[in-house]
Amino acid sequence: MSTKKHNLLANFASSDSRFTQQELPACKPILTPKWVILTFLVSGVVFIPLGVICLFASQGVIEIVDRYDTDCIPLSSRDNKVRYIQGLEDKRCNRTITVTKTMKNPVYVYYQLENYYQNHRRYVKSRQDGQLRSPKDEHETKSCAPEDTLGGQPIVPCGLVAWSLFNDTYDFTRNNQKLPVNKKDISWKSDRESKFGKNVFPKNFQKGSLIGGKSLDQDIPLSEQEDLIVWMRTAALPTFRKLYGKIDTDLQAGDTIKVLLQNNYNTYSFNGKKKLVLSTTSWLGGRNDFLGIAYLTVGSICLFLAVSFSVLYLAKPRQLGDPSYLSWNRSAGGGR
């Protein structure tokens, strides 16, 4: 026997195993009516309590939402909001918020934007992550057009995402006493440590003829510019919230919070909405009833199917593997 044939037979023998021939022991359960009913029953018993727990946690979150984009435009300028927001008029606006239930600290301050598509492909691609991490890559601005360079020098951070940084501001007072907003650690720690360099500083940012949003302090590294870090984590949906800061004191029921805000950010060009949100959190996060409702819905459907199949099984039992149900054993009149 030649060496070639010997090797061929050896390879064939080595591949002729229970694994390659798919002969390993396996569990192949048969979906009998009892197993189907039991599966739906267990699923319903598990999902419904989970839904109640999640919904209860969500309902425990206290949230105050105040839409201000329209109310902070003077009546005389509401016919042309874009011209007002792009003008030089004073954009200060006073708002009053009443706390309906006691809010334990920390109270999170968010800004909410609607009809704002941060997931647009051209918008998302208009950034340079390498430039954010290292000063060696500050000239890598090819993907940032049109906000890539100014007078032949690179813009740091470049791109439309950074250029459109949210620039409304909020100042809170209660009983004529200022409520400080803590803006430390509002961004992800992993972003601060790995995505934004400690030796990368803003350059030529918001210095062009068109100003998109907030300016950055050129003496503070990007790793400490937490408003920017929060903004650069783009949202997947057109309605989103981003963390503005934290109030590290309790807000009592009945408290009146006065807000002095600067209505600078232009959402009027695309019919967007702006809202100020004060919220507590639970072990599950912020207020979101969807998860609890989803669990309750799926659990209820599973219980309904379990009961329905049980009734059908008891009313019209059918022997498993009955050959009389085979097509060739049925009568010519349509069978059973």
Swiss-Prot record:
Q: Please report a single Pfam family linked to this protein.
A: CDC50
* Signal peptide from the UniProt entry: none
Q: Which locations, inside or outside the cell, does it occupy?
A: Membrane
Q: Which residues form a coiled coil?
A: none
Name the organs or tissues of expression: Expressed in flowers. May be restricted to pollen grains.
Give GO cellular component annotations, separated by semicolons: membrane; nucleus
Residues that carry a glycan: N94, N167, N329
Q: What is this protein called?
A: Putative ALA-interacting subunit 4
Give the chief site where it resides. Answer: membrane
Q: Where is the composition biased (Basic and acidic residues)?
A: 127-142
Q: Which PANTHER family match?
A: ALA-INTERACTING SUBUNIT 4-RELATED (PTHR10926:SF49), CELL CYCLE CONTROL PROTEIN 50 (PTHR10926)
Similarity remark: Belongs to the CDC50/LEM3 family.
The protein's matches in InterPro entries, at most eight in alphabetical order, are given as: CDC50/LEM3_fam
Q: Where is this region: Disordered?
A: 127-148
The transmembrane segments are 36-56, 290-310
| Keyword tags | Glycoprotein, Membrane, Transmembrane, Transmembrane helix
Bilayer topology reads:
Multi-pass membrane protein
